[in-house]
C-alpha cells in the first residue's frame, strides 16, 4: 500500500516541478541583437524576396483567372489587386 502512495507523491512532485520550470522559461524576455559584422545586410536579397512575393502573388492571380475561364487584366502586388477580363478564354 505504501508503494503506490510513494509513487503518486513522487509523480505529483515531479509534475509540479516541471510545470514551474516550463512557465519560468517561457516568461523570460527574449532579445535579439543584430550584428552587421556577423550577418551583413544585403539589400539585393531583400529586393529578391519582394520579387518572389510579387511573382507568387501574380501567379496565384493568374491561376484564379484561369479557373474562371478569363484572361488576367491587372495584377498589382502593392495594392493586392487582381482583376480579370470580361471576355472568356477561347
Swiss-Prot record:
Its main location: secreted. Keywords: Disulfide bond, Secreted, Signal. Disulfide bonds join 58-75, 61-82. Expressed in the pistil. Detected exclusively in the synergid cells. It is found in: Secreted. One of its GO terms (cellular component) is extracellular region. Residues 1-19 form the signal peptide. Belongs to the DEFL family. Inactive pollen tube attractants guiding pollen tubes to the ovular micropyle. This is Protein LURE 1.5. The gene is LURE1.5.
